Amino acid sequence: MAKIAKTHEDIEAQIREIQGKKAALDEAQGVGLDSTGYYDQEIYGGSDSRFAGYVTSIAATELEDDDDDYSSSTSLLGQKKPGYHAPVALLNDIPQSTEQYDPFAEHRPPKIADREDEYKKHRRTMIISPERLDPFADGGKTPDPKMNARTYMDVMREQHLTKEEREIRQQLAEKAKAGELKVVNGAAASQPPSKRKRRWDQTADQTPGATPKKLSSWDQAETPGHTPSLRWDETPGRAKGSETPGATPGSKIWDPTPSHTPAGAATPGRGDTPGHATPGHGGATSSARKNRWDETPKTERDTPGHGSGWAETPRTDRGGDSIGETPTPGASKRKSRWDETPASQMGGSTPVLTPGKTPIGTPAMNMATPTPGHIMSMTPEQLQAWRWEREIDERNRPLSDEELDAMFPEGYKVLPPPAGYVPIRTPARKLTATPTPLGGMTGFHMQTEDRTMKSVNDQPSGNLPFLKPDDIQYFDKLLVDVDESTLSPEEQKERKIMKLLLKIKNGTPPMRKAALRQITDKAREFGAGPLFNQILPLLMSPTLEDQERHLLVKVIDRILYKLDDLVRPYVHKILVVIEPLLIDEDYYARVEGREIISNLAKAAGLATMISTMRPDIDNMDEYVRNTTARAFAVVASALGIPSLLPFLKAVCKSKKSWQARHTGIKIVQQIAILMGCAILPHLRSLVEIIEHGLVDEQQKVRTISALAIAALAEAATPYGIESFDSVLKPLWKGIRQHRGKGLAAFLKAIGYLIPLMDAEYANYYTREVMLILIREFQSPDEEMKKIVLKVVKQCCGTDGVEANYIKTEILPPFFKHFWQHRMALDRRNYRQLVDTTVELANKVGAAEIISRIVDDLKDEAEQYRKMVMETIEKIMGNLGAADIDHKLEEQLIDGILYAFQEQTTEDSVMLNGFGTVVNALGKRVKPYLPQICGTVLWRLNNKSAKVRQQAADLISRTAVVMKTCQEEKLMGHLGVVLYEYLGEEYPEVLGSILGALKAIVNVIGMHKMTPPIKDLLPRLTPILKNRHEKVQENCIDLVGRIADRGAEYVSAREWMRICFELLELLKAHKKAIRRATVNTFGYIAKAIGPHDVLATLLNNLKVQERQNRVCTTVAIAIVAETCSPFTVLPALMNEYRVPELNVQNGVLKSLSFLFEYIGEMGKDYIYAVTPLLEDALMDRDLVHRQTASAVVQHMSLGVYGFGCEDSLNHLLNYVWPNVFETSPHVIQAVMGALEGLRVAIGPCRMLQYCLQGLFHPARKVRDVYWKIYNSIYIGSQDALIAHYPRIYNDDKNTYIRYDLDYIL
């Protein structure tokens, strides 16, 4: 529009032009009536579809219904719906928390299952086996055939079948891989199972009488690469066709009768987990589009195995489902989320394949309708799911004739079906899915809220601890209130054990203690079966915590002692649960496991242990073999190696299976690791048993044999080389023939044998083996590197190897291949490399090694610098700096200064290294001290607290060297700088500054110290209030040092002020702080006199806190020792008159420590304190008598031989009546006093007191007197001879020993 229209024609033309342009506009640019408006996308976001997030159709078949329902589906109108929310930029700024974030997760006690790796999770697939037969029961009678216990023969047969089955599976898998499996018969996929029992070695195509079904061209087109469905060719546990309810795989919808599929391995093997059928593996590829509404359901299944979903149409066969089956992840069939079982459906990880009567939780959890009693043991999610399921089942219930009559008017009748009509039995799904309906109403009714479930009690009644949701499946019977008198004896026993176990697992310590004592005392009464059937499933629980496991293991330990031989039928059960503890990462769990298996072996005996564990030795599962080997080693240590040797010999020479040989040799290895030098008497026998394994045809057996030899040699070090003569040759051949893991094991064995040899042999073997080691230096395998380093260290540590040989042959390739950045990253490699390098330095000298690595102190990788520094520190710590020349010394100081300044991590490697190097160089450091101090002062000003702390720590490491170099002026300057930094706010840094001041005070002395002590100490007094342990410890050490050496520089008033501050430090948790504090009281008392300090301390006896009072009594005793007892005793004895329990006990405690510390000086004070002790020993309060007995003990031991027997005899008359006390603390103190008196007044007097009660008619009296007599006898056996009472000769016997009457 160049110009404005003025005339009528121009205006008309302009209007026409605009209208033309408008008409030409693309229709799509307009806004439709039902479409959305244009919004600012950056404000409102832009979800295009108004139906986004909704499912727009329900698929007719499961195949169409994908799992990714939540992706943006195409809407009905193909348009998007705008979202209204905060601006995107703002949302991006808000940190989005991860889904289901649990704020309490880090404070929750960790579960054992959470930290297990894949290998250790095997333990949960183990089955707690049924009881075994005890051949030794009833004196070895023939067992009753009615007993269901499995014999050794049954177990071995089962093991054999499992092994055979696994081998056939492997062969089939290999054939399938190689494409050698051929179609034997076109109908192999749909062949019905044979009626008679099939033999293990008979394949499916040999079954007679199977009528083949012709495949239609449709089916053949759908199943390319058709393979026969052999019995072994199937993944166990899941029958084909059970994915869709009742569907027959590969069948068309018009097929009139469902065809059967072979019933897989209906019984999975011991280690097999039930899972889905492998897709396409058995020729059962389902048709492309199946309509599940038209399919004919199967009312009976050959193999149960479809987890019931709560929201599906009910089926008649719901009750027959496999209990607790867990679907295999990544299964062959994509399931619709509408048919999915809720995630929380019950199914514990505790194996559910348990045969026999071993309880495994509540089976009814997984059934469609639990009985009312089981409802209580569900978790809230399961309860909710069950409610929904029940409601849907109730609605879909078929109507009865009576209900139909009530609904329809009269005149209707039921039509008979036409002749020959075969119904499609889809409505069969709508038959009741609830075998035990819980009495629901029929027809229409007002839906009142169901309150019954809300009142379900999820906590046991009575005095029982809180029940966690995880425990409900084990303790559900306690939730049901029953009259126990109506129960059978077995049920009563079961409830009793349940209650005790719940108290032990979840109760308070007193409750736990009582329950543990009760279950131990009644163990034989309860019986082994009921006890283990409840304890062992608890130990297999996937939600068990460390503390709970510890307590349950303690229960087993206690009851094993009581049950003794009754435990035999349950040995395998216990081992299945306890063996995994032997490979636990927690050391204490491993020790507990060993303890249990050791006690079990002693209770059950060797024969039972061997017959029980023998089948597991050649188990196909490596996990079982590994844990069995470790358990056997524990049995050997418990019952002695000789008793197990014949068995081990047989196992290691087994011809049938290499697994048995492998496990037998592993047992020998584990025995060596477990028992150490205790194997020496049996070393030759053990070596002979396993030597043939070094030339076995199986690679794994050869490897474990070499590792076992290495373990035996390590345990025998430095003895026993002659026992290994027979294995040297095969080992020697082995290291030339093997590569990889085998070679690593053989090298390890040689490495442990060389240190046992004489020097000349060691030298020869080292030179020979070194060629192979140097070749393996460049191996990329981490395990090989560790072993090579270890062997180099062992070879170079032996006497026969010369330094020259190491310098020329080993060091160049060693540094080339090992001193690399990668080695510093792995902790185990790092440690091994440092140790090996230090060992090489011990042979060739410090300078040779340090000169090769000193430049690496300036490397850019910090972890590598740390490795270099640690090596230098250890070498110089061992060898000093004598052979380090001036040039190397400069490089070293320069390097460590650089490394120290560049460090960023918070460990002490650099600090320790710096300190060690500087101290090793000694006076040679003087030229570098200004540079070092400059660096330290600069870093004390750094804004980073960590840097300041390291600088202060470095001063305390180098103070001694500064003194050696006579740099007192420099130290004085440092002291002033540190004094100025006492206002530091970070406690870690303040602690280091105090430590540095303490180091300077120690070396420079009190009189030369700057700042002067009179200025320094008042500055320290307020710091004593700091509650940080590091600050407290360093501060009290510094104050104590000043009080000891420079007390005269500070006024008495300041020391008293410090005394009051010190009382607070007696509350410290750390023992070192309390010890330093009580010692400081002694120094202060020495400086300013005992009276003021003593007054402060005596007042502190009145406090409530026990730890505080005990420390105060120790301080009083130290003051007495420092300032002579006569300055303290009058005030102390006067304080005893205060009629307060704590004060009197404190005084007695002080006297106890006082007499312990002053020893023989006590002879001057014994008569003074006797009246006080008389009173205390007659007091009603037990603690008074206990403490007074302790005083008598220390006093009598101190004054032995100083002629104070009269007073001590007087005190003995007061101590003696307390011998009948039952309190363990009191009786311990009384026995201690009697021991002390035995030394001081002689065993004769004690024997005279003792003889009165040795033959007393009352047993309790005799017990006490014999206990006292035994202790006198142990202490003074020879001295008693002269004091036994005279018994005169009679007609038959001569009792008098005349030679004892001779007097010269």
Swiss-Prot record:
Family: Belongs to the SF3B1 family.
SUPFAM superfamilies referenced in this protein's UniProt entry, alphabetically: ARM repeat
Gene Ontology molecular-function annotations: chromatin binding; mRNA binding
Localization in the cell: Nucleus; Nucleus speckle
Stated name of the protein: Splicing factor 3B subunit 1
Residue(s) carrying N6-acetyllysine: K141, K214, K554, K562
Keywords: Acetylation, Citrullination, Isopeptide bond, mRNA processing, mRNA splicing, Nucleus, Phosphoprotein, Repeat, RNA-binding, Spliceosome, Ubl conjugation
Site entry: Interaction with PHF5A: E592
Marked site (Interaction with RNA) residue numbers: P469, Y587, C1035, Y1049, L1141
Lineage: Eukaryota, Metazoa, Chordata, Craniata, Vertebrata
InterPro entries: ARM-like, ARM-type_fold, PP2A/SF3B1-like_HEAT, SF3b_su1, SF3b_su1-like
A cellular component annotation (GO) from this entry: nucleolus
Record site feature (Interaction with SF3B3), residues: K602, C677, E1205
Covalent link (Glycyl lysine isopeptide (Lys-Gly) (interchain with G-Cter in SUMO2)) residue numbers: K214, K413, K430
Subunit structure: Component of the 17S U2 SnRNP complex, a ribonucleoprotein complex that contains small nuclear RNA (snRNA) U2 and a number of specific proteins. Part of the SF3B subcomplex of the 17S U2 SnRNP complex. SF3B associates with the splicing subcomplex SF3A and a 12S RNA unit to form the U2 small nuclear ribonucleoproteins complex (U2 snRNP). Within the SF3B complex, interacts directly (via HEAT domain) with SF3B3, SF3B5, SF3B6 and (via HEAT domain) with PHF5A. The SF3B subcomplex interacts with U2AF2. Identified in the spliceosome C complex.
Processing after translation: Phosphorylated. Phosphorylation occurs concomitantly with the splicing catalytic steps. Phosphorylation on Thr-244, Thr-248 and Thr-313 by cyclin-dependent kinases promotes interaction with PPP1R8 during mitosis. Citrullinated by PADI4.
Function: Component of the 17S U2 SnRNP complex of the spliceosome, a large ribonucleoprotein complex that removes introns from transcribed pre-mRNAs. The 17S U2 SnRNP complex (1) directly participates in early spliceosome assembly and (2) mediates recognition of the intron branch site during pre-mRNA splicing by promoting the selection of the pre-mRNA branch-site adenosine, the nucleophile for the first step of splicing.
Compositionally biased region (Polar residues): 342-352
GO biological process: anterior/posterior pattern specification; blastocyst formation; chromatin remodeling; mRNA splicing, via spliceosome; positive regulation of transcription by RNA polymerase I; positive regulation of transcription by RNA polymerase II; positive regulation of transcription by RNA polymerase III; spliceosomal complex assembly
Pfam families: PPP2R1A-like_HEAT, SF3b1
Tissue expression from the record: Ubiquitous.
Chief localisation class: nucleus
First and last residues of every HEAT repeat: 529-568, 569-603, 604-641, 643-677, 680-718, 763-801, 843-881, 1010-1048, 1052-1090, 1122-1160, 1163-1201
Residues bearing the modification Phosphoserine: S129, S194, S229, S287, S322, S332, S344, S349, S400, S488
